[in-house]
Amino acid sequence: MGTKAQVERKLLCLFILAILLCSLALGSVTVHSSEPEVRIPENNPVKLSCAYSGFSSPRVEWKFDQGDTTRLVCYNNKITASYEDRVTFLPTGITFKSVTREDTGTYTCMVSEEGGNSYGEVKVKLIVLVPPSKPTVNIPSSATIGNRAVLTCSEQDGSPPSEYTWFKDGIVMPTNPKSTRAFSNSSYVLNPTTGELVFDPLSASDTGEYSCEARNGYGTPMTSNAVRMEAVERNVGVIVAAVLVTLILLGILVFGIWFAYSRGHFDRTKKGTSSKKVIYSQPSARSEGEFKQTSSFLV
């Protein structure tokens, strides 16, 4: 008898729990997207989905984030003026008639209850695919051995942004130079994201023709023109010659000052000394008893 009562109590508890779960499920709201990341070639139509449930009177808004920029695409179930010519609002999402690379970014679907506290949101990432263009490179024609040399590679059109591979004399340069015998004597840092290749320090074996390739997983990878870089020794002769010329010029300057001083071109009169000259002449012989002052002063 006791066992039967315990079973009935357990069944009753399970029934009550099921009712509570059902009521919670009915009262909850959900917002989701069937495709949280969308990749589409440029100039094609695309739909960003946003499904929701649990709202009796839903208010839908869409915003667009790209870096530090935020724009409103849809407000209160209506497309804003800046998008109304090429975007259509649907209860299940928004549709672009044609996308451009500037549309790449994150879109947030925000759903709230009109006059209520219920709220939900979902983010959809849109990547508009654009193949890379031919990259441009900045490579010095010569660089001094032992110094730092920086090579850059970039292209502006690829979406998503391109990654870069460097070549020396047609051979792929690994990210870690010590991993390949061909580059084991080099000391460089290669950044595939920025396209920067830094030699620090540059060695004689780094002389060669350099080019880079840009690829982003869409379209054909593009390769830059090859540019030759010469790793040259520091010109010690020029440095020695410059030092000798400096010493010679300094010697000439010192000699000139000494010569001018010795010739009296500099005033050597001491302060407080009179510049007047006094000439004194002895009296001439005269008769006894006659005396006359003959001193003369010249100014």
UniProtKB/Swiss-Prot annotation:
The record marks A285, R286 as: (Microbial infection) Cleavage. Residues 28-125, 135-228 form the Ig-like V-type domain. It is found in: Cell junction, Tight junction; Cell membrane. Its main location: other. Expressed in endothelium, epithelium and leukocytes (at protein level). The modification Phosphoserine is found at S281, S284, S287. The keyword Translocase does not apply. Belongs to the immunoglobulin superfamily. This is Junctional adhesion molecule A. It comes from Homo sapiens (Human). The gene is F11R.
